[in-house]
Amino acid sequence: MGVFSGKFIYDKINDVYAFSTKNEQIAYFLQLGIYSSEESMNSDTNSITNKLVIKKNNNYYVYVGISMNKDNLKKVCSLYQKLGYNLYFDEVYIDNKEYLYNLEQFDLLLAKAKSNDEIESINSVILSSYEEMVLNK
């Protein structure tokens, strides 16, 4: 009986340890919209060059920014709000260490960016890096 109790406790501790040492971190995605068809998504977003499209559950999710810092996303958000878009913050867990490290570095740059051109340029690299490093596109 003692062996079984010890094994049970050991397994539970391992489960808790494994959960707490996952490399996932929360990032905030700036969501422009969810579309049920690729045609409607393309029609509504054809003027937006810097975007990330993720297809899941037969829907097309369109994101225009990613950051670990909500204040940085507010900078990006203001660019699209001026164009009349309503945007939403979405929390996403990312477990790609290399991308998370790069995102932290880009967040530092984005925090210091003042002009719209700087913000757009940094944001473009963040989105394309996510496609390349996390989605493997």
Where are these regions (language model features)?
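Acidic/polar low-complexity segments and flexible, solvent-exposed patches
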Residues: 1-137
